[in-house]
């Protein structure tokens, strides 16, 4: 079982330029090297992407519902139209990400260790809740 998902992860990493629209739901991709991957319209529902390298990935209209992206490197990734409902972004690096909105983040889970792009301001309230504000770019 373990060997199967490691082999699958390596196959996906090797074809990272050809993942547009691919169904990767429930995929176990912990620590995957998917920097600059084209994941446009990919189904990543409930995928495990813990500590994955997704720098400069194209996540345009990707479905990341319930995806676990904790501690993933998503710097400079494109989130245009991406679905983040119930996704987990705890400790993720979103520095330099583009097209990420407060509306998307309202549906996601994250913590104080999550790093946001400069145009997104998260204000944590005393009761543990947060408010999101987008700066004009």
Residue ranges and their predicted role:
Residues 1-137:
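Tandem repeat scaffolds
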């Amino acid at each position: 079982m373990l060997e199967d998902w490691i082999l699958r992860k390596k196959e996906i990493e090797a074809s990272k330029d050809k993942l547009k629209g691919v169904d990767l739901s429930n995929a176990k991709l912990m620590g995957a090297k998917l920097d600059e991957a084209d994941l446009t319209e990919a189904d990543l529902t409930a995928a495990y992407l813990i500590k994955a390298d997704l720098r400069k990935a194209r996540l345009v209209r990707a479905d990341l519902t319930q995806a676990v992206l904790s501690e993933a490197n998503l710097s400079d990734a494109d989130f245009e139209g991406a679905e983040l409902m119930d996704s987990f972004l705890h400790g993720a690096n979103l520095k330099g990400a583009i097209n990420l909105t407060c509306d998307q983040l309202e549906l996601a889970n994250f913590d104080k260790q999550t790093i946001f792009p400069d145009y997104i301001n998260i204000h944590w309230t005393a009761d543990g809740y947060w408010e999101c504000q987008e700066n004009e770019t």
